[in-house]
Amino acid sequence: MPDHVIAKFVLLGELEALSPLMVGTGSGDVIDAVVQRGYKGNLPFIPATALAGVLRHNLASKPQTTVERYFWGDTGGSDSGSQSHLAVSDLLPVAGSVPRIVIRDGIRIDSTTGIVADKAKFNFEVVEPGATFAVRLEATVRGWDGKQKNAAEFESILCRIKSLCEAEGFSLGAMTTRGFGRLKLKNARLFRYDFPADGAAWFAFLSSGTPGEKNSRDFQPVQTSQSTFSIFAMFAIKSSLIIGSAPDTPDAPDKSHLQSNGAPVLSGTSLRGAVRSRAERIAATLGGAKGIELLKEVFGWVDPEEGKKTSRSTPLKSRISIDETIIKNVTPAVQSRIRIDRFTGGVAHGALFDSMPLWNSGDSEVSVKVRLSNFTPGEDDWIAGLLLQVLKDLWSGDLPVGGEKSIGRGVLMGKSAEVSWCDTTVSIDQNGDKTVIDAAGREELNRLAAAFGVKMGGC
């Protein structure tokens, strides 16, 4: 059957970065990980391959249907595969915008000692939140695709793409489980061109870049299934909090709190490290080595010795993601400190330094957002129960976050929380010294906690 084009669909829109974005190209001369650049000299952009990979990973069935094999492409492990009928353009910054790139520092904490691991200091570039990139997807319906039947199914897949990119948890790039790469689709529009009737309109679109309104299509509603267990909690800072950031001017304090677009933030990297460390401690206490082994499939795992033959050499991606959030109603203030020589009892030479933590100004707000992806009720209840145990420790101030914890910083106090999964939402509120949960909600949370106990007891 001759190859001829029946129709083309075009999806246009803008992807706005809701959190720091890191689509890297490897290490640079000075920075360990640099963002993808190249558009108009030095502006960052999102490669088409990055978006196409995320869309296919999230939407393609396993195994793929016949229509999906045409839409996404399929090698089939042989020469009989088909090329993708979806063309994705590189996502360039919208006209007139200049995305801001900043450098962040990172460390790796040794979970055994609780201090920075040897040679585990690194830095990386990120694109600041607010950057907006233009989206263009083009799907081609060809002659062997069953004409109008598969054209309608192609349109349905594009509607699912829109729904996915507008969802709260949509992310792309590196460190997405640490709060990076959160994106949201805005101003989405869909257009259809049927051939040969719309041939002139199509060439006019290619020439001008502006689609004809008569070819505009309405997005069809898409049914989405909820498969996420999530915790959204609000805390207050008991005293002070600092997540260290290197000084950017000579007269700045030796260490100040991390900021994003000028606002102090609770970074997903810092909070996720604290959550994982406490989860491992709980699992090791109740389940021993087998409890720790179970957490590898929850928090992710990479072989620490590259190239070493192990029983599980394939890296595992974390199912836990934690957002980076803005801290409100706090006051930064410099505090000078000294180091005492333990032998003389006097000030050690050259040991005067200062830091600028955030201090509670009376009604501080620190939000925590934790998600467990691909949640299966019953099977994954024990993971939800473990996360509730960690939430309890955060809530009661037993799990400090950030730096300088040994001098009392980073202690949080729970104010309110919502725990959601499937069609269930449980609200938790702190009223003075009492934690308030309705009877039905308390029963559900106790059931999840019991499932974790059974899982660890079975180890």
Model-derived features with residue positions:
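Small/polar/charged residue-enriched interaction surfaces, especially the RNA/DNA-contacting tracks
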Residues: 1-459
